[in-house]
C-alpha cells in the first residue's frame, strides 16, 4: 500500500489529554456535564475513582458530579452547600471533607472542582478531582481527627476564616493539567511568574486544530513535495554520472589529470546536505497512523532510519576538491554509495503507481538506467583485459576487435629514460596512431614497465558500442557482432542475459501476470480508490463529505490492509476460525462480563464479533436508530449526545449499547454516539448474540445481569421498543370509516342478525361517477327495495326492531352530517324508477356502486332502510366474515331510510318556500303593476286558474300578470257571490334570461315590459300554436272573464314563448329555482303529479 498521508482530521483530544496528565493518585476524577443545570450528571469516570470509592462505572454514570452518593453522617453540611454553589455558579472550588466508600468506610478527601470551557468560552464540563488524604490527616493516630473535635467543625475548612481557595489550590492537579511537571530552568523570573502570575491554561473541550511549529514541514505538504522533486532529479543525475565516472574516467585518465568538478556536481552535493537538515524538521507517520509533530520524536526517528545513509551519500568530495583540499585518490569511489538513495525514491514514487502511464514511464527509465550501468561495466571489463597484458596486447578482447574494425588498433610504446617515446612497436600494431583517438594522450604504464598503451577507439565509439551490447543482451540474446571472447566477458554476458530476461518480461510484457501478482494488493487499493473518486465525481459529492469518505477509506485500509476477513476465513474450518476469532478479540472476551462463560460459549461469541472503525465527527449511532449491536471501544474516545447535550464521554474499555432485548424486540437508541478521535471498536451483533445464548442457555441469565453493570451508557434506557408482529401485515383490505365504527359501538344494544354467507353482494358506489347523477339516483324514492331471495333463509333485520321515532329526530346530527354533493338547479334530478343493475349511467368507471344482501323477508323485515352513517356517501366494507356482511347490510338499510326521511323533509320545506314566495310577490304586484291604474288592483292579485303568467321587468320588482288574451276574452276568473275566491295556481317564475328551456316539451310564457312602453301596450304572450286575439276593450280588460287556456295547448310544444314582434324569448335556466304545482280549484285543469315527488 502507498505511504499514508496520516490521520490529519481535527480531533477532540480532551479525554486523552486528561488521561495522560493524570496519573497515580491524581487519576481519581469524574467529568460532569455543566450544561444540565441542577443535576450536572457524570459523563466520564476514571478507573482510579472506581478503585477509590468501590463503585463501578455503570453505577457512577449519570449521577451528579457532586458525588452526593459518597456523603455520610460526618460529611460537613457547609461543604455540601459550597460545592453546590460552586457548581451552580461555574466557579472553581477546593475543600477537604469526609466521604464514604461503597463499603461504608470513611476517608478524608481533597476535592477540587475545576470548570472546563469549550471553544465558545462556555463552561461545558466540570472536572471533579478526588484525592485520598487520610494518611496525612491520621498521622497522629487513627482517631486523631475525632479527638480534635469531630468531623463537621474541622472538615469545613474551606469556609473557615482566613482560608484562601486560590492559594490552597492543588499544585499537583493543576500542574498535571497544565503540563508543568516537565523540567524547567530555575530562575527568579519564572518562579515569580508561576506563583504570582496568571493561572495555568486548562485543556478545553473542543475540536483541537493541528498544532505545529512554523519551522516544521508537513511530509505531505506542497513545499515538501517540491523539494522532493529536486531531490529526485539530483538522485537521477547521481545514478547516471557516478557509474560513468567510476568505470570510464578511472580506466582512461590518471587521477592527477582529473579536472575540477562541474557545477552540477557541486549543486547536487549542496542539495544532499540541505536535505539532511530538512529531514530533521519534517513530520512522519507513526505505526499507529498518527502524524508526529514533536521535533524530538522527529529527530530520533530520522537518526534511526535514513540518517547514516544520507550522510555517506552527501560526503562533499567534489566540494573539497574545489577548495584545493587533498583528497585520497580513491575517495571518489565512495560516490557509489549515493546510489542507495534510489531506495528512498520508492516510497515517494509509489503514490504515482496507480497511473498506468507513469508506471510505464518509470519502467522504461529503470530499464534505460540499468542498460547504462551494464554498458559502463562492460567497457570497464574490456579496458581491464587490455591493460592486464604483461608484454603484448591480447587479440581476443571486444575492444581489440572494435579497434581493428575501426582501424584504430592499440599499440605499446616504450618510454625512454629522457622521457621520450621509442618507435619500437609490436608487429601486430600499426606504425602510426590516430591523432583523433582518445588513447593518444594517455600516460598510463602497462604493468609498471616502461611500456605505454596508446591508440584504440575513441571514448565515444567505445561507450556507444558498450551500450549497444547492453541493450541487445537485455532485450534478447544478442546479434553476435559484439561478442564476449574472454572468460570474464562471458561470465558478465551470462549475468546480463539473466537480468535482460527479467527486464524484458517486466517492460515489454506490458504489466502482465507477473506484475499483477507483484502488485495485486496495490492494484486493489488503487482500484477501490479510483472507484470511490469516480463515484464522488459522478454524484457530485460536496467537498466536506468527499474528504470524510476518503479519510474513512484510508483509515479502514490502514487497519485491515484491504483484507476481507470474512471472505478470507470463510474457507477455513469452524474450529480454526473460532480459534483465530478468539485471538483477534481476546481483549473483549477478557471483560468481567464473560468470566462465567464456558470456552465453547466464548468461541461462539467470538464468531459474532466484528471490527468497526469511526473517524472524528462521524456518528456511530443516531438517536432513534434500531440498536443492532453492542460496541466495545478498543481505542480512541467518543461522546454521547442528546439534543446537543453531552451525556457521556467514552474511552478505551467502555461498553455501549442496551440491555439484552428479547429476540423479536426492537430497541431504539435514545441518544447519538459520535466519534471524537479515530476509534477502533469491536461490534457484537445482537443476532449472533441471541444465537450464541440459545446454544448456551445457562449463561444467558448471568450475561443479562452482568450487562447492566458493565454498560458505560445504556442507549436503550427509555428508548422506544416495539414487538415485530408480522401477522398484522397480512389482512383483508376492509373499507370501514371511523363513523361506522363509532356507530357500531353505539348500536351494540340492538339485535343484529347476520345475513346468510352465501348471498351475493352488490357493487359499491363507483368513485368515478359524477356527484349529480349519483346523488340523484340515490335519492330517487321509487328505487325498489331489495327483493327477497328465493329459497334463502330469512333473518329479521335491524329495521324491524327499531323504534318508530328513530327518524331524523332520533339522529340530530344526521342532516348536518349528510355530505350530499351539490346539484345545480338547472339539471333536473334523475328520478328514474328503474332498478339499479350495478352500473350507473354517467359514470367513468364500471365498478359497482352498492352492496346489497337480499334475504328472505319475514314478518319482522322492513323494506324501509335503516339509518346509515354520518359520513356522506355510503362506504360499504367488504369482508370475508358473515357478521361483517350482516352489519354492512343493516347500515345500508338504515342509510337509505334516513335519506328517504330527509327527502320528505326537503319536500315539506319546498312547499313552505312556495307559499312564502306567493306572499312576497302578491303585495308587490298590487302597488307596482304598470298595467293597472291607481284605483284598480292588478289583475294578478285575483286568484284564478293555473295560467301562464308574465313577469314585468321594467318595474323595480317583479310582478305576475295574467295573459292579455284571457283578459280580452273575459275568461279571467272573478269571485262568485257566496263562494270563496279561487286559488291562484303558482307558476314557474324567475327573471328572463338568454338560454333555452332545460326540459323538452315544457313551455313557460314570459314577457318583458319596460318604462318606455305605454301602459296597455304589452304584447300577448301566447304559444305559437294559439292564434292572436283581437284587441280588448278597457272594460273588458277589467271585467271580462277570459277563457281558460288548456294545459295541453300550453305544453304542446317545447319551443320557448314568443316575445315582442314574434321573437322567441329565451329561458333562464341559471335563475330557475323550483318547479312546483299547487292545489287545484274547482273547474280548473287537473295537473298530473308524479307520485311521491311533489312535481
Swiss-Prot record:
Segments of skewed composition (Low complexity): 419-436, 857-872
GO biological process assignments: potassium ion transport
CDD domains xrefs: CAP_ED (cd00038), PAS (cd00130)
Biased composition (Basic and acidic residues): 137-150
Effect of substituting residue 428 to Q: Impairs trafficking to the cell membrane. Impairs N-glycosylation
Pro residues bias (residue ranges): 974-991
PAS domain span: 18-90
Positions of the UniProt region annotated as Disordered: 137-161, 417-447, 740-823, 854-883, 965-1069
InterPro entries noted in UniProt: cNMP-bd_dom, cNMP-bd_dom_sf, Ion_trans_dom, K_chnl_volt-dep_EAG/ELK/ERG, K_chnl_volt-dep_ELK, KCNH_animal-type, PAC, PAS
Signal peptide bounds: none
Domain PAC: 93-145
Residue numbers on the Extracellular membrane side: 250-259, 324-331, 383-464, 486-490
Protein purpose: Pore-forming (alpha) subunit of a voltage-gated inwardly rectifying potassium channel. Charactherized by a fast rate of activation during depolarization followed by a rapid inactivation at much more depolarized value causing inward rectification due to a C-type inactivation mechanism. Exhibits a rapid recovery from inactivation.
UniProt similarity note: Belongs to the potassium channel family. H (Eag) (TC 1.A.1.20) subfamily. Kv12.2/KCNH3 sub-subfamily.
Complexes and interactors: The potassium channel is probably composed of a homo- or heterotetrameric complex of pore-forming alpha subunits that can associate with modulating beta subunits. Interacts with KCNE1 and KCNE3; these interactions regulate KCNH3 trafficking to the plasma membrane and its subsequent voltage-gated potassium channel activity.
PANTHER family: POTASSIUM VOLTAGE-GATED CHANNEL SUBFAMILY H MEMBER 3 (PTHR10217:SF481), VOLTAGE AND LIGAND GATED POTASSIUM CHANNEL (PTHR10217)
Protein's name in the database: Voltage-gated inwardly rectifying potassium channel KCNH3
Amino acid at each position: 500500500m502507498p505511504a499514508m498521508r496520516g490521520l490529519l482530521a481535527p480531533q477532540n483530544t480532551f479525554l486523552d489529554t486528561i488521561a495522560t496528565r493524570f496519573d497515580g493518585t491524581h487519576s481519581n476524577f469524574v467529568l460532569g456535564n455543566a450544561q444540565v443545570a441542577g443535576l450536572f450528571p457524570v459523563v466520564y469516570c476514571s478507573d482510579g475513582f472506581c478503585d477509590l470509592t468501590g463503585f463501578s462505572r455503570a453505577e457512577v454514570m449519570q449521577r451528579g458530579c457532586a458525588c452526593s452518593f459518597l456523603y455520610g453522617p460526618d460529611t460537613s453540611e457547609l461543604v455540601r452547600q459550597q460545592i453546590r454553589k460552586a457548581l451552580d455558579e461555574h466557579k472553581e472550588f477546593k475543600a477537604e471533607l469526609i466521604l464514604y466508600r461503597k463499603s461504608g468506610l470513611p476517608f478524608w478527601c481533597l476535592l477540587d472542582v475545576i470548570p472546563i470551557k469549550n471553544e465558545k468560552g462556555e463552561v461545558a464540563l466540570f472536572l471533579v478531582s478526588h484525592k485520598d488524604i487520610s494518611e496525612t490527616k491520621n498521622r497522629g493516630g487513627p482517631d486523631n481527627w475525632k479527638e480534635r473535635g469531630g468531623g463537621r467543625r474541622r472538615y469545613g475548612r474551606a469556609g473557615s476564616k482566613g482560608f484562601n481557595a486560590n492559594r490552597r489550590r492543588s499544585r499537583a492537579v493543576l500542574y498535571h493539567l497544565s503540563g508543568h511537571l516537565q523540567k524547567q530552568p530555575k530562575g527568579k523570573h519564572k518562579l515569580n511568574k508561576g506563583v504570582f502570575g496568571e493561572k495555568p491554561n486548562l485543556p478545553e473541550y473542543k475540536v483541537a486544530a493541528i498544532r505545529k511549529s512554523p519551522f516544521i514541514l508537513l511530509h505531505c505538504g506542497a513545499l515538501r513535495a517540491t523539494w522532493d522533486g529536486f531531490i529526485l532529479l539530483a538522485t537521477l543525475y547521481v545514478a547516471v554520472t557516478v557509474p560513468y565516472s567510476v568505470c570510464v574516467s578511472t580506466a582512461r585518465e590518471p587521477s592527477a589529470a582529473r579536472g575540477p568538478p562541474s557545477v552540477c556536481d557541486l549543486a547536487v552535493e549542496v542539495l544532499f546536505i540541505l536535505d539532511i537538515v530538512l529531514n530533521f524538521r519534517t513530520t512522519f507517520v507513526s505505526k499507529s497512523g498518527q502524524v508526529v509533530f514533536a521535533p524530538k520524536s522527529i529527530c530520533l526517528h530520522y537518526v534511526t532510519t535514513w540518517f547514516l545513509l544520507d550522510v555517506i551519500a552527501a560526503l562533499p568530495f567534489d566540494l573539497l576538491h574545489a577548495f584545493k583540499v587533498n583528497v585520497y585518490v580513491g575517495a571518489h569511489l565512495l560516490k557509489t554509495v549515493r546510489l542507495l538513495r534510489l531506495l528512498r525514491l520508492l516510497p515517494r514514487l509509489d503514490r504515482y503507481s496507480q497511473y498506468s502511464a507513469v508506471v510505464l514511464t518509470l519502467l522504461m527509465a529503470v530499464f534505460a538506467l540499468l542498460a547504462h550501468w551494464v554498458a559502463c561495466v562492460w567497457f570497464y571489463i574490456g579496458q581491464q583485459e587490455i591493460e592486464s597484458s604483461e608484454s603484448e596486447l591480447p587479440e581476443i578482447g571486444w575492444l581489440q576487435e572494435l579497434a581493428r574494425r575501426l582501424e584504430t588498433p592499440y599499440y605499446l610504446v616504450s618510454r625512454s629514460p629522457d622521457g621520450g617515446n621509442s618507435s619500437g612497436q609490436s608487429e601486430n600494431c600499426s606504425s602510426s596512431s590516430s591523432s583523433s583517438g582518445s588513447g593518444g594522450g594517455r600516460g598510463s604504464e602497462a604493468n609498471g614497465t616502461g611500456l605505454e598503451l596508446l591508440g584504440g577507439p575513441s571514448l565515444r565509439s567505445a561507450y556507444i558500442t558498450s551500450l549497444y551490447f547492453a541493450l541487445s543482451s537485455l532485450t534478447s540474446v544478442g546479434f553476435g557482432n559484439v561478442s564476449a571472447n574472454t572468460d570474464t566477458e562471458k561470465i558478465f554476458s551470462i549475468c546480463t542475459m539473466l537480468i535482460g530476461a527479467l527486464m524484458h518480461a517486466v517492460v515489454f510484457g506490458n504489466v502482465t501476470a507477473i506484475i499483477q501478482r507483484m502488485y495485486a494488493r496495490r492494484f486493489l487499493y488503487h482500484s477501490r480508490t479510483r472507484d470511490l473518486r469516480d463515484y464522488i465525481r459522478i454524484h457530485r459529492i460536496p467537498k466536506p463529505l468527499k474528504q470524510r469518505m476518503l479519510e474513512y477509506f484510508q483509515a479502514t485500509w490502514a487497519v485491515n490492509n484491504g483484507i476481507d476477513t470474512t471472505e478470507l476465513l470463510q474457507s477455513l474450518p469452524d474450529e480454526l476460525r473460532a480459534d483465530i476469532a478468539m485471538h483477534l478479540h481476546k481483549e473483549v472476551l477478557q471483560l468481567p462480563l464473560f468470566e462465567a462463560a464456558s470456552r465453547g460459549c466464548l468461541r461462539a461469541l467470538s464468531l459474532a464479533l466484528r471490527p468497526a472503525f469511526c473517524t472524528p465527527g462521524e456518528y456511530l449511532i443516531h438517536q432513534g436508530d434500531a440498536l443492532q449491536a453492542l460496541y466495545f471501544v478498543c481505542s480512541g474516545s467518543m461522546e454521547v449526545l442528546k439534543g446537543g447535550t453531552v451525556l457521556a464521554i467514552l474511552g478505551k474499555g467502555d461498553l455501549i449499547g442496551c440491555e439484552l432485548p428479547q429476540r423479536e424486540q426492537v430497541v431504539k437508541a435514545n441518544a447519538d454516539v459520535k466519534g471524537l478521535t479515530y476509534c477502533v471498536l469491536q461490534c457484537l451483533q445482537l443476532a449472533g448474540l441471541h444465537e450464541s445464548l440459545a446454544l448456551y442457555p445457562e449463561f444467558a441469565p448471568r450475561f443479562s445481569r452482568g450487562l447492566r453493570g458493565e454498560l458505560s451508557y445504556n442507549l436503550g434506557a427509555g428508548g422506544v421498543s416495539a414487538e415485530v408482529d408480522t401477522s398484522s401485515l397480512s389482512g383483508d383490505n376492509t373499507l370501514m370509516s371511523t363513523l361506522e365504527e363509532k356507530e357500531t359501538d353505539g348500536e351494540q344494544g340492538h339485535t343484529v342478525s347476520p345475513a346468510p354467507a352465501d348471498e351475493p353482494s352488490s357493487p359499491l358506489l363507483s368513485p368515478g361517477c359524477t356527484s349529480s347523477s349519483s346523488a340523484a339516483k340515490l335519492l330517487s324514492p321509487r328505487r325498489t327495495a331489495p327483493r327477497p331471495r328465493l329459497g334463502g333463509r330469512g333473518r329479521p333485520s335491524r329495521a324491524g326492531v327499531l323504534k318508530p321515532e328513530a327518524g331524523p329526530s332520533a339522529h340530530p346530527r344526521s342532516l348536518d352530517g349528510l355530505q350530499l354533493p351539490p346539484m345545480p338547479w338547472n339539471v333536473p334530478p334523475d328520478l328514474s324508477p328503474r332498478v339499479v343493475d350495478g352500473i350507473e349511467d354517467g359514470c367513468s368507471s364500471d365498478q359497482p356502486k352498492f352492496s346489497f344482501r337480499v334475504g328472505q323477508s319475514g314478518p319482522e323485515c322492513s323494506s324501509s332502510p335503516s339509518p346509515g352513517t354520518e359520513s356522506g356517501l355510503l362506504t360499504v366494507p367488504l369482508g370475508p366474515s358473515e357478521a361483517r356482511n350482516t352489519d354492512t347490510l343493516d347500515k345500508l338499510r338504515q342509510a337509505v331510510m334516513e335519506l328517504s326521511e330527509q327527502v320528505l323533509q326537503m319536500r315539506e320545506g319546498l312547499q313552505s318556500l312556495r307559499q312564502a314566495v306567493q306572499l312576497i310577490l302578491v303585495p308587490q304586484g298590487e302597488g307596482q303593476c304598470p298595467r293597472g291604474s291607481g284605483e284598480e288592483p292588478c289583475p294578478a292579485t285575483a286568484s284564478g286558474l293555473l295560467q301562464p303568467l308574465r313577469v314585468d321587468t321594467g318595474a323595480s320588482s317583479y310582478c305576475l300578470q295574467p295573459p292579455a288574451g284571457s283578459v280580452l276574452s273575459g275568461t279571467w276568473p272573478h269571485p262568485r257571490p257566496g263562494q270563496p275566491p279561487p286559488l291562484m295556481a303558482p307558476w314557474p317564475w324567475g327573471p328572463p334570461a338568454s338560454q333555452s328551456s332545460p326540459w323538452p316539451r315544457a313551455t313557460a310564457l314570459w314577457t318583458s315590459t319596460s318604462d318606455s312602453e305605454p301602459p296597455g301596450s304589452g304584447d300577448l304572450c301566447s304559444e305559437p300554436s294559439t292564434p292572436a286575439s283581437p284587441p280588448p276593450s278597457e272594460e273588458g280588460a277589467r271585467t271580462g272573464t277570459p277563457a281558460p287556456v288548456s294545459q295541453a295547448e300550453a305544453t304542446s310544444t317545447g319551443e320557448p314563448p314568443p316575445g315582442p314582434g314574434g321573437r322567441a324569448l329565451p329561458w333562464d335556466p341559471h335563475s330557475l329555482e323550483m318547479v312546483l304545482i299547487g292545489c287545484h280549484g274547482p273547474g280548473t285543469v287537473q295537473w298530473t303529479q308524479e307520485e311521491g315527488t311533489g312535481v
